[in-house]
Amino acid sequence: MLDPFCFLKMYLKERVEVKTKSGEAYTGTLEGFDEHINLMLTCSSVEGSEDKVLFLRGENILFVGPRLLL
């Protein structure tokens, strides 16, 4: 099984999709993370609105994965 920190390092500076426990979906470029899996996304968007920088608290994150272009 892949260590979560190794997984996140693979996606640094890449477009990712993040789902939260409350059901929200965010997309953006993963700029950084810490030991609590708090994430910093840039050029992020959620449900049609865009922000330059977004911070997501690790305890609220359900999953992180590559942004799939469909």
From Swiss-Prot:
GO MF term list: RNA binding
Tree of life domain: Eukaryota
GO BP term (any one): RNA splicing
UniProt keywords, alphabetically: mRNA processing, mRNA splicing, Nucleus, Ribonucleoprotein, RNA-binding
Key word rRNA processing present: no
PROSITE patterns: SM
GO CC aspect terms: nucleus; ribonucleoprotein complex
Pfam families: LSM
Sm domain mapped to chain residues: 3-70
Transmembrane segments: none
SMART domains membership: Sm (SM00651)
Localization terms from the record: Nucleus
Family: Belongs to the snRNP Sm proteins family.
Function: Binds specifically to the 3'-terminal U-tract of U6 snRNA.
Protein name, as recorded: Probable U6 snRNA-associated Sm-like protein
Organism: Encephalitozoon cuniculi (strain GB-M1) (Microsporidian parasite)
Origin organism lineage: Eukaryota, Fungi, Fungi incertae sedis, Microsporidia, Unikaryonidae
